[in-house]
């Protein structure tokens, strides 16, 4: 199996070198919000490779390391000689200080360890243009700069950090000890905008319209006269991929809709009617529910579930593709967050995404992932730009493994039915309350836990259903949704009264991190 790259080589971009910060994806996201394309690159990238990527700017992310420890994440020193503007954030500032001849010590030794919001006081600088002389920022550092490199000047301090911002304006190298990418830094977006537009001289013209034109051109060049298979789930991601591919290659696209028996209530019919009927996509439906459920019988480990579903999904494709001629490519709706969360060289795997892991190496297709540089909100914007209606673009996110990862433990038809029915009630009531645009994602989970209850005149011993509802911008971080109590009560009453084998409802009030959005 080979992967067709969707690297946007000719796009004006700022790259973020990944040093393992929990916030590094947010840096990239904030730069995109400014109108400049941005992507993460390994901290191991060489100066020659940076020159090949040809960015207009480089950001060194924060991270958990200490620059003076053996094995800490490093940087090719020649990158500082490329003449490309550089912004070091937190560990990134400490690293550039260390590499360019300054001094970094454990913050405890300097007496200036900082965690949480702090007041930054700055002097005039291109980085802080049009921001107040005093502003609130988020500090999160265990080490500190005590001496700055030659030709650098101090431009910012805080009560506990004498070098909160430094710069060498002649070489366009800047360092800040705080995190501008998080909302707690009140003028963080302005600082990043100053770096991107004023210092890096980026045009700020990145848009979904540009993305469509570039991707259509790239898809046509890649595919030629061959045919492409797309696994259509009816979710936002695969639907947007389908419409984008159809716009690029028309009838060369064949959509295979795999009904794996793990879909939401009424979803199979909706997919065929909506995308096959209204949009005219050529859809082949594969009824494979028994095949998937047989493979999943007795399996309770979530990673194993994902791998099984990922493998079976592609094997079904193989079966369908063998009936067709000139099919060379398989398209997937992999997002940038999927790629990031499946692990980098600075972070452990959070979970294996079915669009990233689990694909057999002997797969006979080449892989096309047109969305793998986009975040979720950008995919919605892309769908709108493609002329797709709101009820598709704003459809609830749904994982490829479907309800398999919303049933804890072993999957049974009874458990699946409790999730299908309870989820339908949840979606209906959230829409009735006018909250469907305010809540980024919401669904129900069969926890696998049974508890004692009383219904009518008898005792019950039935399942506990959890409601998960979160607010987010891009899926990288999330908070639980503050649904009004009266709405939650109505949902709870309906589920226990209308769904068999359920007698208890709980509400998940965990943010991301520490939890992921899905339970498995």
From Swiss-Prot:
Pathway this chain belongs to: Purine metabolism; GMP biosynthesis; GMP from XMP (L-Gln route): step 1/1
EC class: ligase
Annotated Glutamine amidotransferase type-1 domain residues: 13-205
A molecular-function term among this protein's GO annotations: GMP synthase activity
Residues annotated as catalytic: 90, 179, 181
EC code: 6.3.5.2
Keywords: ATP-binding, Glutamine amidotransferase, GMP biosynthesis, Ligase, Nucleotide-binding, Purine biosynthesis
Residue span, GMPS ATP-PPase domain: 206-395
GO biological process: GMP biosynthetic process
Tree of life domain: Bacteria
Any Pfam family the entry gives: NAD_synthase
Presence of keyword Nucleotide-binding: yes
The keyword DNA-binding appears for this protein: no
Biological role stated in the UniProt entry: Catalyzes the synthesis of GMP from XMP.
Family annotation (NCBIfam families): guaA_Cterm, guaA_Nterm, PRK00074.1
Self-association state and partner proteins as the record states: Homodimer.
Protein name: GMP synthase [glutamine-hydrolyzing]
UniProt organism field: Streptococcus pneumoniae (strain ATCC BAA-255 / R6)
Gene that encodes the chain: guaA
């Amino acid at each position: 199996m080979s992967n067709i790259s969707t690297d946007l080589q000719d796009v004006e971009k700022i790259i973020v070198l990944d040093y393992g910060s929990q916030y590094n994806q947010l840096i990239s996201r904030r730069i995109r919000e400014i109108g400049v394309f941005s992507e993460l690159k390994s901290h191991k990238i060489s100066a020659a490779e940076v020159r090949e990527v040809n960015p207009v700017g480089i950001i060194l992310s924060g991270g958990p390391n200490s620059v003076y420890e053996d094995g800490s994440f490093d940087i090719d020193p020649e990158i500082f000689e490329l003449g490309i503007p550089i912004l070091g954030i937190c560990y990134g500032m400490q690293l550039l200080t260390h590499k360019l001849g300054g001094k970094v010590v454990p913050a405890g030794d300097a007496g200036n360890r900082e965690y949480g919001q702090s007041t930054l006081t700055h002097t005039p600088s291109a980085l802080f243009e049009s921001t107040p002389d005093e502003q609130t920022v988020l500090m999160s550092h265990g080490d500190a700069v005590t001496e700055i490199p030659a030709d650098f000047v101090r431009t910012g301090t805080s009560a506990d950090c004498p070098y909160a911002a430094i710069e060498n304006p002649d070489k366009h190298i800047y360092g800040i000890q705080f995190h501008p990418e998080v909302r707690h830094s009140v003028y963080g977006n302005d600082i990043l905008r100053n770096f991107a537009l004023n210092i890096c001289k980026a045009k700020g013209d990145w848009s979904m319209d540009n993305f469509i034109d570039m991707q259509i051109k790239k898809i046509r060049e890649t595919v030629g006269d061959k045919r492409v298979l797309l696994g259509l789930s009816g979710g936002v991601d695969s639907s947007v991929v389908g419409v984008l591919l159809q716009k690029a290659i028309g009838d060369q696209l064949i959509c295979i809709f795999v009904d794996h028996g793990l879909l939401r209530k009424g979803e199979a019919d909706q997919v065929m009617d909506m995308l096959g009927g209204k949009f005219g996509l050529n859809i082949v439906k594969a009824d494979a529910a028994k095949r998937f459920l047989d493979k999943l019988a007795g399996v309770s480990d979530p990673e194993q579930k994902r791998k099984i579903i990922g493998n079976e999904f592609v094997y079904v494709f193989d079966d369908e593709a063998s009936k067709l001629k000139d099919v060379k490519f398989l398209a997937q709706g992999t997002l940038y967050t999927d790629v990031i969360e499946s692990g980098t060289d600075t972070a452990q795997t959070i979970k294996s995404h079915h669009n990233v892991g689990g694909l057999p190496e002997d797969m006979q297709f080449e892989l096309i992932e047109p969305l793998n540089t986009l975040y979720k909100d950008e995919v919605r914007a892309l769908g709108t730009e493609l002329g797709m209606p709101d009820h598709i673009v704003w459809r609830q996110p749904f994982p490829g493994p479907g309800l398999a990862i919303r049933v804890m433990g072993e999957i049974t038809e009874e458990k699946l039915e409790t999730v299908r029915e309870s989820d339908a009630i949840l979606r209906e009531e959230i829409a009735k309350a006018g909250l469907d645009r305010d809540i980024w994602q919401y669904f129900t989970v069969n926890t696998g836990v049974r508890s004692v209850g009383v219904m009518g005149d008898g005792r019950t011993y039935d399942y506990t259903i959890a409601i998960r509802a979160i607010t987010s911008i891009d899926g990288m971080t999330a908070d639980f949704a503050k649904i009004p109590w009266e709405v939650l009560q109505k949902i709870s009453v309906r589920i226990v009264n209308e769904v068999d084998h359920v007698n208890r409802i709980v509400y998940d009030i965990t943010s991301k991190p520490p939890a992921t959005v899905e339970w498995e």
